[in-house]
Amino acid sequence: MVMLRSLLVSALAALAAASPIAEPADQSLEARQLGSSNDLTNGACKDVTLIFARGSTEMGNMGTVIGPPLCSALKSKLGADKVACQGVGGLYTGGLMQNALPQNTDPGAISTAKSLFEQASTKCPNTQIVAGGYSQGSAVIDNAVQQLSAEVKDKVKGVVFFGFTRNLQDKGQIPNYPKDNVKVFCAMGDLVCDGTLIVTAAHLTYTINAPEAASFLASKVQSA
């Protein structure tokens, strides 16, 4: 375990030190500057609610690599007035060491994400929920969806993962959730997707997948 933790710290330090990937120019000022979005907790109900969990060490509750670009792309697909974007904050700190835990994140992070799904369901009973997670955030969403009640889980129409840390363990899907409603993006050379905790440059390239991921989520909402 000591060796694993040492490897984890040295490998994931690259993520903390890396310069953010350039983001689309049409993102909201809030997302660009703060890496956060609280449309669900602070705003009015929308037709679609995106719940997103950022990667380790990323700023805000949406991060920078893929969270804000995904939100922006989904709003472009479905209409800015139709989509609420909500990042997972609270007890999810995005710390490095949590990646080495059995669920590849900690119980507090999972509980925080789960509560957001439940809030979307109760506060906005007519909203269609979609979700996404990057790096450690993919484990947060994966585990949270598994813990949802059948009623809430049925409202989750689609999930996208980027650099899925549980890709090998969960066979590219979320246990007990429709496989066709999950799309996993694993860049060539991203060893995180192979069941390791080794971060390579490929792990930081997922910004380019925002349009395709948004199209997938939009298709699930529109076909529901």
From Swiss-Prot:
Any one GO molecular function term: cutinase activity
Catalytic activity: cutin + H2O = cutin monomers
Cell compartment(s), UniProt: Secreted
Keywords: Disulfide bond, Hydrolase, Secreted, Serine esterase, Signal
Pfam family for this entry, one: Cutinase
InterPro entries tied to this protein: AB_hydrolase_fold (IPR029058), Cutinase/axe (IPR000675), CUTINASE_1 (IPR043580), CUTINASE_2 (IPR043579), Cutinase_monf (IPR011150)
GO biological process, alphabetically ordered: carbohydrate catabolic process
Disulfide bonds: 45-124, 71-85, 186-193
Protein name: Probable cutinase 1
Organism: Aspergillus flavus (strain ATCC 200026 / FGSC A1120 / IAM 13836 / NRRL 3357 / JCM 12722 / SRRC 167)
